[in-house]
Amino acid sequence: MIFDKVSLNEGNAYNQKTGEFTATVGGVYSFNWKILTEKGKYFITEIVHNGNLIAYNHCDGRGISSGYASSSNQAIIRMKKRDKVWIRTHGGNGIFAHGGWCDFSGYKV
């Protein structure tokens, strides 16, 4: 997934073209992401570290009668310099994510 609205990108660790966060130095990093979907839709995402699945985020609006559903998750990951983290859809299960209301953040702890 590419989060195209970037409000802060200290050190340019987030690549807006690829959606990848690249560690500029080694250490422990915290990552958070939020997904919003509308009534009747769902969207499943994964956070990935160098191609390895770390955690899921399942946003399910199929059981609500109106409005939107949101879901968030956090992952703490030990990274080496130049390691990459990104968010991807899970196994083709992404049906609808409400663009401007989804976000991703990462920082060194």
Stretch-by-stretch model annotation:
Residues 1-109:
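Extracellular jelly-roll beta-sandwich "head" domains, especially the C-terminal globular C1q domain
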